[in-house]
Each structure stands twice: as C-alpha cells, then as structure tokens.
UniProtKB/Swiss-Prot annotation:
Family: Belongs to the SELO family.
UniProt KW Lipid metabolism keyword: no
Cofactor(s) it depends on: Mg(2+); Mn(2+)
UniProt-recorded Gene Ontology molecular function terms: AMPylase activity; ATP binding; magnesium ion binding
Name of this protein: Protein nucleotidyltransferase YdiU
Top-level EC class: transferase
Organism: Pelagibacter ubique (strain HTCC1062)
Amino acid sequence: MTIGWHFDNSYSRLPKTFKENINPVAVNAPEILILNKDLANKLDLDFSNINDDDLSKIFSGNLLPEGSNSIAQAYAGHQFGHFTMLGDGRAVLIGEHLTKNNERFDIQFKGSGRTPFSRSGDGRAVLGPMLREYIISEAMHFLKIPTTRSLAVVKTGEDVVREQISQGAILTRVALGHLRVGTFQYIAAKQNISDLEILINYTIEKYYPNIKSSKNKALDLLNVLIEKQTQLVIDWMRVGFIHGVMNTDNMSISGETIDYGPCAFMDVYDPKTVFSSIDQLGRYAYENQPKITKWNLTRFAECLIPLISTNEDEAIKLATEALDKFEQNYETKWLNMMRDKLGLYGEDKEDKNLIMELLNWMKEKKADYTNTFIFLMNKTIKNSEVYDNADFDLWKTKWMKRLVMFGNTHDKSVDLMSSCNPMVIPRNHKIEEALMLANNGDLTLFNKLIKILKNPYLVNNGDLELMSPAPHSDEKYQTFCGT
C-alpha cells in the first residue's frame, strides 16, 4: 500500500519512564465512517487507492502502518484541583509522521483499547463523543484557533458500556504533539532531575528550537508556554468556547487545544456559563478560563524549579516574576481582541468601559454572544428583536462615535470585525442533532455542518438556521466527557 507514511518516532526513544510500549487492541468488525481528505493532503498522505476495508483496518489499529511504533504516554494531572498519576488509558500514539516539508505530526488512536495506564477503564470510546471531537476540533481549526485535528473515525463493531450500551469507535487524532503540563508533573513527581532535563531538552528541540541556545532553558520554556497559553485562552474567549475540563493533563505544551470531552460553545452571553455535567462548582466556567490557565501554568512552573536555578529561593523568585506578568498580558490581549471584535482601531481610554457596557447589556438581556457581533456588522440574523432596545441604541451611538476616531470608516471597521467574528459556530443543539442522526447511520447533517464550519467567517443567508441559537435558551444543556 503506497500511502506516504514516513515515521520518525522521537518520543519512543526517550527513557522507559516516559511511556509504555503497547499495540492497539484489535477490534472485530471495523468500519470507516469518516476520512478527512483535506488533512490527509496536508500530511502528504494518499488514501485514494485504498479500499474501505483496508482503511477500516488501518484506522482501527488492526493493521499498523510500516514504521509505526505504538506507545501509551505517561503523564499526571490535577483533575479539578486534585493531583493524580494518569497516562494514556484509552489511546496509543502510533508514531510521529514527517511530511515532505519535514513537518512533524503525532498520529494517535483514541479508543484503541486498554493500556498499562487504564486502571479500571475499558480503554474504549463511544461513537458520539468521537464524532463530537471530530467536528469541534475541525471547527476550531477553521476558526483559526490552534488545535489538534481529526483524520478519521472508525466504528469498531463492538458495544461499549457507559450509562447505556453504545457503539464503539476510534478517532485518529493529529497533533503537533501530545506533551502536556501533566507530562512534566509526572516526571517531576519521580524526582529524577536527569529525566526532567531530558524532557526539557526534548520539548525545546521539538517545539521551540529558537530557545535551544538559551542560558536558562527551563525559565525560557516557562515564558514561552505562558505566552502560548495566554493567546490560546484569548482565542477561546473570542468565540465563546468553553473547554469544560481544563485539568493540567489537558494543557498542551505545543499550545494547541486538546481533549474535547465536555466542551461547548456559549449561546446566550453569561460569563458564568458551565456545560460540563461534572463541573458542579463552575471551576472551568467561561469567565474562569483565564484564571485556570494561570493556575495550570503555575503547576508547570513548579515542575521546572530545580532546573531554573540550583538556588530554590532564586528559582521561585524568577518563576513568580514570569507568572506575575500573566494578568497584565492577558488584560492587554483581551482588550485588543475585543477592540477587533468591535472594529475599533487605535486605543482610547474609554474602550474598556464601552466593551463592558455591551457585555453587561448582553448578560442582562440574554443576548446571543456570537450573533450580537454579527448584528453590529449589519448582517442578517434570526431573532433580532432583542436589539430593538433603548439601552442598546444608546450604547450603539457611543460605539459609532468611537468607530470614526483616528480617521476610521465604518466599512473599514466591518472588515476588521469580519476577520475575527465568526458568522457560524458549532451550535450545541445542531451538534447534538447531527450526533443523534449519525448514531442511527445518517451522516447527512454531520457532513453539512462540517462543510459550513470550514468557512465560519463567510456564511450565506441560506444558512441562517445553522447560525441561530436553539429556539430556547441552552441554560440546561449539559455535556459529558464520554469516559
């Protein structure tokens, strides 16, 4: 089979502490459901001459590609604030694929069976959550947000027992890497400085070679990740994305969004929005995502202390100074992001007040977060009656005055707004409808959503139904992690 796989498995060459060698557990009757041909092309992979039967074997793990070397990665994590040793309990990294341009991508099977890290789990995944990760990760990519992507989904032909009996599935995830803050926590917990140094050098070599010659690699790695994760959470806030399970094992060192378990997009603007059924106290609510980002980065910094300086007090001082810049950096980036969403060029001292007035009005009137910005661009939306409001008109007058500052024009502002305000997001009720149909063998709506979400900033009025929130508020909408 000439597909174009070219594996160079650098992580497999790390010491045994970092991973366990394990093959995917074969499944009975794999059936390919989705193959992401656009992503395959980006990876320089050609599946055009491969029949569905062989595709099913490849993406179920029943037939591993030549050159692959499958492993389960070890990591730890703070899960809702509580530290625990974890690891890939239902996934295997089959290898690192190199494209013709020497770009390196992890290829991982999720739902591929038990591993030494499975504990009491069955190592399997359910069809609905795997399709959900596929569609939302692809949507995030086209929203211009760093993310893992999905290459394929295969039904296993086997039942999986959760709250009910469901169809089993395996997702093929593609990522710049699967190193997590939790990877560093795992190695740090072993208190082996040599392994920690190996991990830092490996991380810099793979992701951040520009700091390879740094005099303080550990400190510079901390600074790089602070910057990466600050920008990532800004992007989430921009589109109303709520990750739902921001445990340290779900914070990627590459700066990608990873692990789409109970995530969802906010419809009605409410900063306290939580969708995850297990987040009863709202730890990972929309408004808390920046704070949790810093909390996770602090856990990362703790791992690096021994290599920031041999003097522990000095190391803590340097790490704290780096972390203390987070709030101001986030505030500056958030303000600039919101200026872009409102088409505001330049800076005015009243900008934050103007932004907060709008957000407070949206919260009070239960206005849709995405559609409010679409409405301000003079685009057609359904259910625009909420904007027929005296307070909104008063705010809009102030906004229009601010738009023309610095010699700006309304048309120029709309161009700026159009580049960062999506016309369409993965609406929760539409995702659920598509998944319900897909579970019954009908992928029509799923494929339609994928097609539209590939161009989120350019949507026709004919797609108004897919742009609109649920007929009733999604206050009671809940998501589940699928494990």
